[in-house]
Amino acid sequence: LCVVGDEAKIDVIVENHGGLSSNGKWLAGTLKKVAHPRCGALPDFGNFRIDEKEQYDRYQGVDELMPFARGVSAKSHDFDERGEEIHTDFHRMLELVVGKHGWRGFVGIEYEGGKLSEEDGIQATRTLLERVRDELTAKLEAAKAADGAAGAGKAEGGGK
């Protein structure tokens, strides 16, 4: 499939979506063995159910799949009164995706809840993503400013 994709200049991506594909370690290992430049992953925040009895850790799974990511899917189901997704800690997830792995591409939105309309669920997810993005940006800028101030202090006092 990747050979055909290569000829057409199309990436072939695999989403964790139940069964073995929801085992992040297994899927990452499979993608590593394929070792084709057109083969990648679409880590989905909410698809880590291996079977009826086994759930794979979503944060570990996304972490394992991000080196192969060609896109990211922010799946949501339900929100609390503060607008936080109750099944996935979006702050923790985006720290992994954006912070640790440096993702700068698109983040798709999937709403699969039943309490909001599809449109309202998508909007609630977008609002949450934008809020977390702004918080992460502010945190990064504060860290850069602190590093800059520390560096300036060293430069001023460095000759003593």
Question: Predicted regions span which residues?
Answer:
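Histidine/acidic residue-rich metal-binding segments in metalloenzymes
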Residues: 2
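Histidine-acidic metal/acid-base catalytic patches
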Residues: 7-9, 20-160
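Structural motif
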Residues: 15-17
